Each structure stands twice: as C-alpha cells, then as structure tokens.
Amino acid sequence: SEMCIRDRPYNDGKDVSENDYVDVRLDHTLARPNIPFMDVQLYDWTPREASVYGPYSPKKRLVSLNSTYYSPIWPYMNALNFYVIRYADLLLWRAEAAIETGDLETGRKYINMIRERAKNTQHVKTMDQSQDAANYKVGVYDEPFKSKNEAVQALRMERRLEMAHEGIRFFDLVRWGVADEVINAYIAKEKV
C-alpha cells in the first residue's frame, strides 16, 4: 500500500533509516546529508555545527546556483515572489473545518488532493540523475477515516509536511490547543 499515516505511527519519534520510505516533500523542503542540494552538490552538513543546529538546512524558497534567476553577487537575492497564503493552505483549512465539524469524508477528500499532488511531484534525483535520491512513497487515503481522531492526526501531519519552513506551525499548534505540550516536549528533548 502507499505510505500514509496508517502505515507508520504518527510522530512516533523514531529516526528514519536510509532504507525507509519517505515523503518526497522532505527532500524538497530541507537539505539532508548525502542527498543532492538543489542540483549543485551533495549536501555536506559538517560546517554547520550539527551538535547545535542539527545536520539539516532549509531548502524551501531557495534558487539553484545553476538557475538564471540566481544572483551570484552580494546580497545573493532572487526574484521569487513571497506568498502569504498558498492554495495548499486553503485546501488544508477546508479539510480542517470539515473534520472539526464532523464531515470526515470531505476532510479526507481535501487531504487527498494535497497528497495526490505530492505523489506526482518530481522526485529529487542522485547527482548523476540516474535514480531517486531516496525511497519516496506518498499515497492517498483510500478508505474513510475510522474516527475523528484519525482524521485530525492525518490533517496535522499533512500540514506539518506541506507547510514546513513557512513560519506557520506555531500558529497551528496554538489553534489546536497543543502549543505548550508540543513545545515543552521539544525543549525537554533538545536540552539533553
């Protein structure tokens, strides 16, 4: 079956191995060690002080160094427009409203619209372009959600994947009433 929240426990806290399936949006959103960074080179996290900042770097809204839109002189700006609201955000708001009012089927429909687009997104390739850089797998929810809780968990994971690095997660956590729980758990783990 295609990978959905049903295939792996939601936010189980376990690291993904190089043989596990991952959502293709992961490698379009952040740079991971040994995965091509844009189309320039393999990402090398060693200059980043991983013990402080972690081994990952954001990729969203960056332009490839090989792009004609990239300015190779200071201040290294590009002409990408800044968006305030994306269409995907609207679809996920609609899904959330439907789920919160008990219409789980409409919520599933809108979540699946996002997942279908992600499923058909171009995969990040190895540097020689011969194969996918990771084991990518994204599926849709073929069967109705079994409960409101399952629908809520699917929606929250979808927002986390789709809207990553866009500066809105905190507001999602506040709206859902879980900001203190999630942030305190994160701080407790990170301070060790």
Question: Which role does the model predict for each range below?
Answer:
Residues 8, 13-192:
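Acidic/polar-rich alpha-helix caps and helix-coil junctions
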Residues 3-5:
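Short, small-residue-biased leader/transition segments that mark boundaries at the very start
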